[in-house]
């Protein structure tokens, strides 16, 4: 299957946007430009160097440190809100996308369902897969790729009390007493 290509020659950053109103009022720019998560970025280094983005960040921080809450992410959004592109969802599939509370967006955004089933980059934005109590539906993908590195077989050491508490919490989900925060990916696979 052929992937659509995007030109970022005259842009600086590619990512997926956010709708949090507070970001725009704090950083003082219009919501129509959106806000991006800086955890996964594709950066045009030529643009970055030519426009001295690093110096701009330093100057902005010194002048407006009271506006900065999310460090580099806020700085980049405040400075580059007009100079970014958004890539397809599959290049930055975040934890939120797998949450039940977000599932209505799967119908709203073309490509999101495909991204959930076949992500190019998984961005674990909440509990990390190495956290014993992580219940991310693709937690095992992390360990699959970890096992392809020199750290093969490395797993976190979990104390007995944490194992018992987490086991009890998982039992609540398994028995249906508590509803999972995450979607069931099998439901999306069957609908294809």
Give the location of each predicted region.
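Short, small-residue-biased leader/transition segments that mark boundaries at the very start
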Residues: 3-8
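Conserved catalytic core of nucleotide-sugar-dependent glycosyltransferases
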Residues: 9-59
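A glycosyltransferase accessory/donor-loop signature
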Residues: 38, 43-192
């Amino acid at each position: 299957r052929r992937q659509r290509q995007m030109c970022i020659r005259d842009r600086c950053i590619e990512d997926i946007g956010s709708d949090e109103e507070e970001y725009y009022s704090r950083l003082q720019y219009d919501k129509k430009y959106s806000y991006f998560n800086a955890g996964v970025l594709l950066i045009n280094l030529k643009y970055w160097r030519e426009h001295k983005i690093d110096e701009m960040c330093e100057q902005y921080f010194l002048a407006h440190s009271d506006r900065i809450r999310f460090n580099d992410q806020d700085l980049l959004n405040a400075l580059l809100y007009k100079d970014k592109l958004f890539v397809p969802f599959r290049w930055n599939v975040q934890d939120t996308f797998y949450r039940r509370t977000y599932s209505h967006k799967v119908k709203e955004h073309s490509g999101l369902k495909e991204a959930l089933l076949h992500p190019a980059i998984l961005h674990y934005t909440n509990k990390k897969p190495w956290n014993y109590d992580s219940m991310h539906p693709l937690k095992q993908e992390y360990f699959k790729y970890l096992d392809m590195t020199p750290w093969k077989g490395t797993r976190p050491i979990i104390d007995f009390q944490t194992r018992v508490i987490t086991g009890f919490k998982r039992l609540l989900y398994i028995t249906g007493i508590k509803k999972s925060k995450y979607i069931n990916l099998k439901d999306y696979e069957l609908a294809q």
